[in-house]
Regions:
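Long, charge-rich alpha-helical interaction segments
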Residues: 193-253
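Soluble catalytic domains of membrane acyltransferases
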Residues: 4-193
Length: 253
């Protein structure tokens, strides 16, 4: 763990506890290390990596959009465990650029550290309670790391769900839920036979894992209706109208 990462982690752990009224962790990981790729929803832009890193034990390296990395910012971002990820919408040769990034990710996992990836690839301008389709990059990185290590160590992948009543409202509530993990080593023979098929199937499985960890409104046209129903019934994760007697774990379900 780099000193600046530790300092920022310590400061934010306290300040975010002041910002949020209640913070609930469901199935939190118990170890700082573990070679696990955590794939999270990306509901609240800048807030998501802060709460996932600060309120859960694992030491993580963040996959961050590449356009924030400049010759001046790169050393600072690296010191707080941030790695660039190149997307097609960034207008660069993603395959060539990401090959270098995958190599760095493999070194991170080989060092018994963890990765945090926001699998949707981007966040909505307006906070909505739904999961967009998950990209295949997280699973690709996992198998790339296993090949880098000659399959000598175990690499896991798990889903993380960030559930906010309202991410930017002070003294609102937050629940972070973690799914069971998948050991990618178990799929070695299938991967070596048909890698694309295995990557696609596991990506779908991880997507379902994340959906089960959040309040997921599958139809985007029903998100406003869902919010209105929560207000009327005083159930769910609405930040204003809710029954305080209902446990936060029950509300996000």
């Amino acid at each position: 763990m780099r000193p600046l990462y530790l300092f920022v982690w310590w400061c934010l752990s306290y300040s975010l506890r002041l910002f949020y009224r209640r913070i609930k962790l469901v199935n939190p990981p118990k170890s700082f290390f573990g070679r696990t790729i955590y794939v999270s929803n990306h509901a609240a832009s800048f807030m998501d990596p802060l709460v996932v890193a600060c309120f859960r034990k694992p030491i993580v390296f963040f996959m961050t959009r590449s356009d924030v990395f400049t010759p001046l910012s790169r050393p600072l971002l690296w010191s707080v465990h941030m790695l660039p990820i190149y997307r097609q919408l960034d207008g660069v040769n993603t395959k060539e650029k990401n090959a270098e990034v995958f190599q760095e990710c493999s070194k991170v996992l080989k060092g018994n550290r963890n990765l945090l990836i926001f699998g949707e690839g981007f966040t909505d301008d307006v906070f909505v309670r739904r999961l967009k389709p998950i990209k295949k990059g997280a699973v690709r990185i996992g198998f790339s790391a296993l090949e880098y290590m000659n399959w000598s160590e175990k690499v896991y992948i798990a889903g993380v769900g960030c559930n906010y009543t309202e991410p930017n409202r002070m003294r609102s509530d937050l629940l972070i839920s973690t799914s069971e993990s998948i050991c990618l080593n178990d799929y070695r023979s299938d991967y070596e036979t048909n890698p694309n098929k295995v990557i696609s199937e596991l990506t779908i499985r991880v997507e379902k894992f994340i959906q089960s960890q959040i309040t997921h409104v599958a139809n985007p046209h029903l998100t406003e209706l869902h919010e209105e129903i929560m207000i009327l019934t005083r159930k769910g994760m609405n930040s204003i109208c809710f029954d305080d007697k209902i446990d936060l774990t029950s509300r996000f379900r």
